[in-house]
Design a protein with these regions (language model features):
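Alpha-helical transmembrane segments of multi-pass membrane transport proteins
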Residues: 1-334
């Protein structure tokens, strides 16, 4: 449960499942194994819980989706991801507790308010990064781009001056790594404009709408089909690529059946997150295997039950709009 809760907070800072697994996994997987949990279970929990960070703001994937969808409110998307992200965490906690009791895993240290307060005092500066982005964007203090820049400067100051965990040599490595990631995203975003023009000119969205509506006029079945398509793509393509390619093609279908683009943002992100845990590509799966030393085949076998829990949450946020739309609605963002 601590592992899953840690992913919620870390995901709010990184917004990346791969970063979550690589960072927390290197610490928590050996720690859990030392306390009596087997490596397969420890790694499966770490990997599946890492997907929460892609839903809980600030999520850079939500921003990519907002651009691909034609300028949807980033604030609304951020708020729409909170409840699904927390719901996923709760479901994974309940399932992990069930497996722990069933397999007679050792009990951890009892919860205490003093321990919670100590942890909060240590992490309060880091959590400020999340507050800058979420509060700033939601309440219109600054844009998503401005909030990212301010949060970046804040995180740099905290890392080097408060926690003193980074020197200039490490800063250079961080900048290099960030530039590589940024270059990939910028190439995809720059290509999304011409790609969108081409598919519009060729009337591909209209053809997809007619084809899918020709199969069935049931909203339930159409949404199920869309989820299946994205899940399959998630096994072979990267997340940003799926968002940029799928969004302009499927958006007309979704609008024709009255499905909210805000709700689809959460559905799409969770679909892609599940893809990160499935072979043959499965980036998070390979990272987890590398950290724990458990072969991919055996690790995936132990991950399947957690994937089923994630699919359950996916169906819930697909067919229960209130899960994603209530919070943005209460804040007047819809």
């Amino acid at each position: 449960m601590v592992n899953i809760l840690a992913s919620i907070f870390f995901g709010g800072i990184s917004g990346s499942a791969t970063a979550d697994t690589a960072s927390l996994g290197a610490i928590l997987i050996p720690m859990m194994h030392k306390q009596g949990y087997d490596k397969e279970f420890s790694t499966a929990v770490t990997m599946s819980s890492s997907v929460q960070g892609m839903l809980i703001p600030p999520s850079h994937n939500m921003i990519i989706y907002a651009m691909a969808a034609g300028g949807i409110s980033v604030s609304a998307l951020f708020m729409a991801g909170i409840v699904p992200g927390v719901l996923l965490g709760v479901v994974l906690m309940i399932f992990s507790y069930y497996l722990s009791v069933k397999r007679n895993y050792p009990k951890g240290t009892p919860f205490s308010l003093s321990g919670l307060w100590t942890a909060l005092k240590k992490s309060i500066w880091g959590l400020g990064t999340v507050l800058i982005v979420v509060v700033g964007v939601v309440f219109g203090i600054f844009t998503a781009t401005e909030s990212a820049a301010i949060a970046c400067v804040y995180a740099l100051i905290v890392s080097m001056c408060v926690y003193r965990e980074m020197d200039f040599k490490e800063l250079i490595q961080v900048v290099k790594s960030s530039l590589k990631t940024l270059a990939t995203v910028l190439v995809l975003i720059s290509a999304s404009g011409p790609f969108g023009f081409c598919i519009t000119y060729l009337k591909i969205p209209e053809m997809v709408v007619h084809a899918m509506l020709g199969l069935t006029d049931s909203k339930f079945l159409l949404l199920l089909l869309i989820n299946l398509i994205i899940l399959v793509l998630g096994t072979i393509l990267g997340m940003a690529s799926i968002i940029v390619i799928v969004t302009p093609i499927l958006m007309p279908v979704l609008l024709s059946i009255g499905f909210s683009p805000i709700q689809f943002g959460a559905v799409l992100i969770l679909n892609c997150g599940i893809g990160l845990l499935t072979p043959p590509v499965g980036g998070v799966l390979f990272i987890g295997s590398g950290i724990s030393g458990v072969p991919i085949e055996r690790l995936f076998k132990h991950t399947v039950p957690f994937l089923l829990m994630m699919l359950l949450v996916l169906l819930m946020i697909t067919y229960i709009p209130a899960i994603t739309l209530t919070l943005p609605g209460l804040l007047g963002l819809l």
